[in-house]
Amino acid sequence: MAGHSKFKNIQHRKGAQDKKKSKVFTKLIREIVTAVKTGASNVPENNPRLRKALNAARSQNLPKERIDKAINSANDASNNESYMEIRYEGYAPNGIAIIVEALTDNKNRTASEVRSSFTKYGGILGETGSVNYLFNHCGVIQYPINIASNEDIFEAAIQAGGNDIISDYITHTIYTDIENFYKALGFLTDKYGIPEDSYIGWIPVNTIIIDDKEKAKKLLKLIAVLEENDDVQRVFGNYMLSEDVYEIIQEE
């Protein structure tokens, strides 16, 4: 009986992992299609957004045939598939500002689903521009801490045109102006390889510390539900979990 239960748990975890991977692949494919359709070239070297999208896809092990299919689909003049880039803004419980970036082929559907998620978990969806003043809009490039020393990565970031770099015990994070993002990303990719993550995003000017476990779980549930939406590419918030709350949640 115990063996059967363990098997079921393994199957459940595998199913959840497969579902999560499928959603990641869907988001990657949408970004590839959008990069091709909005770029001036199908050649990654001449289309920085496409180069970034392809690097991200390969780092997530998106099969080559699916990458090629996405590019061919985007190049097909008879294919009307296209995605709109839309930003949603609102508040989670306890005054946490949330920005949601989406790529969608149906903005009414996405708006309804995002609004429903906010409402279900105690938040409120506002108008575009209602919270973005609480964030800096900039480029972010992240490498594992062991890729280079703090001094070397700092020097490389300056050469790449970065504005700031923060190194903790896990990650080097380089910040850039939006207009310099792809140039900096190309420079650092040539020097250190594909980064762990890179994006143009929203970094909070100030953060609200969440030091209550139940409040943290409710907030993280809202963010998880938003991120599970196929149309949602990224979710940003101006919060940070306290060390104690983070450790408690990690253990559960």
Swiss-Prot record:
This is Probable transcriptional regulatory protein RP455. SUPFAM superfamilies: YebC-like (SSF75625). Pfam families: TACO1_YebC_N, Transcrip_reg. One of its GO terms (cellular component) is cytoplasm. It comes from Rickettsia prowazekii (strain Madrid E). Its main location: cytoplasm. It is found in: Cytoplasm. Keywords: Cytoplasm, DNA-binding, Transcription, Transcription regulation. It comes from the Bacteria. GO terms for biological process: regulation of DNA-templated transcription. Belongs to the TACO1 family. GO terms for molecular function: DNA binding. Residues 1-22 are annotated as: Disordered.
